[in-house]
């Protein structure tokens, strides 16, 4: 949620350079359409694609298109990537504000990171779910030992990256193509370049990552 978690002021630091040049934006998790509207207003020259498990076509307009996609399904993500490749569609910005489940965050990152343009930005919102306790319900998804072991905050804080939900081929691509990772835990910002500071000691408060491609 772009406005609800006050992300906008933080994103400006990273996205302003793309504001006039961006042509394609993708957001996973549409909810009430407010974030799509924010991207529509901010990136005046960009087409925006929304992906959600529910039909959100009511938010379509001249530059916004919505499609049904379940990010828990590798098959559906693969089909989306295949369609983008067929249409030569790449993105300046991809935002994952979907299920917030750590497995889904990593599966989606592994599949969609290739769709970023050089210097493109990939954002994963609400990684505070990495700290939910075993057995706790995460927006309808149950936290498990495996998810706690490979939570998304720890995943992004370590190199080379290892994930049971991302193929070796995609992990190699990610490790070779990431320029930097920035993690912020409202209201503090942690920018680390190629060195990462673990933030595991901080309480879970809408932790978000900003990942730039080379």
Predicted regions and their residues:
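A short alpha-helical cap/connector motif
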Residues: 1-95, 99-124, 128-214
């Amino acid at each position: 949620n772009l406005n609800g978690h006050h992300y906008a002021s933080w994103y400006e630091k990273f996205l302003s350079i793309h504001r006039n040049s961006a042509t394609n934006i993708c957001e996973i998790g549409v909810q009430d359409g407010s974030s799509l509207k924010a991207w529509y207003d901010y990136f005046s020259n960009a087409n925006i694609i929304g992906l959600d498990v529910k039909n959100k076509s009511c938010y379509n307009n001249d530059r916004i298109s919505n499609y049904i996609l379940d990010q828990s399904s590798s098959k559906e993500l693969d089909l989306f990537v295949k369609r983008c490749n067929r249409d030569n569609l790449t993105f300046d910005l991809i935002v994952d504000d979907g299920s917030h489940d750590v497995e889904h965050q990593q599966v989606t990152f592994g599949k969609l990171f290739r769709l970023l343009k050089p210097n493109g930005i990939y954002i994963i919102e609400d990684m505070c779910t990495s700290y939910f306790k075993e057995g706790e319900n995460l927006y309808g998804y149950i936290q498990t030992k495996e998810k706690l072991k490979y939570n998304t905050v720890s995943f992004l804080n370590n190199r080379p990256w290892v994930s049971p939900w991302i193929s070796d081929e995609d992990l190699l691509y990610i490790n070779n193509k990431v320029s930097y990772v920035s993690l912020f835990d409202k209201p503090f910002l942690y920018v680390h370049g190629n060195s990462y500071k673990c933030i595991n000691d901080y309480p879970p408060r809408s932790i978000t990552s900003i990942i730039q491609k080379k």
